[in-house]
């Protein structure tokens, strides 16, 4: 995988310190670079995004991507944004078609 080629590790279903799981985690040694959660339903999406942000925060991630296949903007004008901001988690909603390119760009920016 592209991560290992440049010194990062990708871990599927990373177990968190409190027993939850993060769908995909990008790590570099002991540093937690990026938590990625895949959401395939628009039902309760705001609450699910908040839960994902709490999981990421509690496990030491400050960057979270929500991979979301729908065209609507689940966080636009949302009460959830304020709570996530207070956690100090940088969150981005990413379309599945953009994930690989965005991961490559993020990791390249961290290496060079």
Q: What would you call each of these model-derived segments?
A:
Residues 33-35:
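Hydrophobic "anchor" residues on beta-strands that sit immediately upstream
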Residues 1-31, 41-46:
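Active-site metal-binding core of divalent-cation-utilizing nuclease and nuclease-like domains
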Residues 14, 39, 95-97:
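Residues at the C-termini of beta-strands that transition into short coil/loop
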Residues 17, 70-71, 98:
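Conserved beta-strand edge residues that scaffold enzyme active sites
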Residues 1-2, 27-29, 62, 74-112:
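Non-catalytic C-terminal interaction segments of nucleic acid-processing enzymes
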Residues 38-93:
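Catalytic cores of nucleic-acid endonucleases
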Residues 23-25, 48-51, 106-108:
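Surface-exposed beta-strand edges and their flanking turn/coil or helix-capping segments
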Residues 18, 23, 59-62, 112:
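Acidic-enriched, low-complexity/disordered segments with a strong bias for Aspartate over Glutamate
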């Amino acid at each position: 995988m592209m991560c290992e080629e440049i010194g990062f590790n990708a871990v599927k279903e990373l177990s968190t310190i409190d027993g939850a799981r993060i769908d995909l985690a990008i790590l570099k040694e002991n540093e937690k670079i990026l938590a990625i959660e895949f959401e395939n339903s628009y039902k309760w999406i705001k609450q699910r995004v908040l839960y994902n942000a709490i999981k990421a925060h509690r496990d030491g991630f400050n960057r979270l991507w929500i991979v979301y296949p729908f065209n609507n903007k689940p966080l636009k004008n949302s009460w959830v944004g304020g709570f996530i901001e207070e956690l100090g988690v940088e969150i981005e909603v990413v379309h599945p078609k953009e994930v690989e390119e965005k991961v490559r760009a993020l990791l390249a920016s961290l290496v060079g």
